[in-house]
């Protein structure tokens, strides 16, 4: 199982966006990068064309390396990064990600 998946709430632990939180929109496994909502915004200059009617400067998220992200346990009161252990959900008998400290489910589950 991957440590960080689409829909997970993460905290940035390094770089210019340190301590900010966001939701993972997309993960690129081979490149080890992820796009996080509202983080690492870049400006792209686009020409107007048939598909993209408006041209000009568009702001969008750029990928950030997975080593700069950490999962958050949103049920715990503190916002420290979470170390993950794997267990099975008794209801569905599937693998799930659990917080080591609080034993809560983590991620977008």
Curated annotation (Swiss-Prot):
<dbReference type="InterPro" id="IPR005825">
    <property type="entry name" value="Ribosomal_uL24_CS"/>
</dbReference>
<dbReference type="Pfam" id="PF00467">
    <property type="entry name" value="KOW"/>
</dbReference>
<dbReference type="GO" id="GO:0003735">
    <property type="term" value="F:structural constituent of ribosome"/>
</dbReference>
<dbReference type="InterPro" id="IPR005824">
    <property type="entry name" value="KOW"/>
</dbReference>
<comment type="subunit">
    <text>Part of the 50S ribosomal subunit.</text>
</comment>
<comment type="function">
    <text>One of the proteins that surrounds the polypeptide exit tunnel on the outside of the subunit.</text>
</comment>
<dbReference type="InterPro" id="IPR014722">
    <property type="entry name" value="Rib_uL2_dom2"/>
</dbReference>
<dbReference type="GO" id="GO:0006412">
    <property type="term" value="P:translation"/>
</dbReference>
<keyword id="KW-0699">rRNA-binding</keyword>
<keyword id="KW-0687">Ribonucleoprotein</keyword>
<dbReference type="InterPro" id="IPR008991">
    <property type="entry name" value="Translation_prot_SH3-like_sf"/>
</dbReference>
<dbReference type="Pfam" id="PF17136">
    <property type="entry name" value="ribosomal_L24"/>
</dbReference>
<dbReference type="GO" id="GO:0005840">
    <property type="term" value="C:ribosome"/>
</dbReference>
<protein>
    <recommendedName>
        <fullName>Large ribosomal subunit protein uL24</fullName>
    </recommendedName>
</protein>
<dbReference type="GO" id="GO:1990904">
    <property type="term" value="C:ribonucleoprotein complex"/>
</dbReference>
<feature type="region of interest" description="Disordered">
    <location>
        <begin position="85"/>
        <end position="109"/>
    </location>
</feature>
<dbReference type="InterPro" id="IPR041988">
    <property type="entry name" value="Ribosomal_uL24_KOW"/>
</dbReference>
<dbReference type="GO" id="GO:0019843">
    <property type="term" value="F:rRNA binding"/>
</dbReference>
<comment type="similarity">
    <text>Belongs to the universal ribosomal protein uL24 family.</text>
</comment>
<dbReference type="InterPro" id="IPR003256">
    <property type="entry name" value="Ribosomal_uL24"/>
</dbReference>
<keyword id="KW-0694">RNA-binding</keyword>
<keyword id="KW-0689">Ribosomal protein</keyword>
<comment type="function">
    <text>One of two assembly initiator proteins, it binds directly to the 5'-end of the 23S rRNA, where it nucleates assembly of the 50S subunit.</text>
</comment>
